[in-house]
Amino acid sequence: MIEPLLCGIVLGLIPVTLTGLFVAAWNQYRRGSAL
């Protein structure tokens, strides 16, 4: 039994986590290209 609140939190955290990883990877790539 998955609680709706827990399900909502997970569904909310997934995009935030993916966005954070994408931004971190982009910053590393940009920094590597600049050097």
Swiss-Prot record:
One Pfam entry name: PetG
Protein's UniProt keywords contain Electron transport: yes
Transmembrane regions listed in the UniProt entry: 5-25
Main location group: plastid
Subunit field text: The 4 large subunits of the cytochrome b6-f complex are cytochrome b6, subunit IV (17 kDa polypeptide, PetD), cytochrome f and the Rieske protein, while the 4 small subunits are PetG, PetL, PetM and PetN. The complex functions as a dimer.
Family indicated by similarity: Belongs to the PetG family.
Function: Component of the cytochrome b6-f complex, which mediates electron transfer between photosystem II (PSII) and photosystem I (PSI), cyclic electron flow around PSI, and state transitions. PetG is required for either the stability or assembly of the cytochrome b6-f complex.
Protein name as catalogued: Cytochrome b6-f complex subunit 5
Lineage, opening ranks: Eukaryota, Sar, Rhizaria, Cercozoa, Imbricatea
Gene that specifies this protein: petG
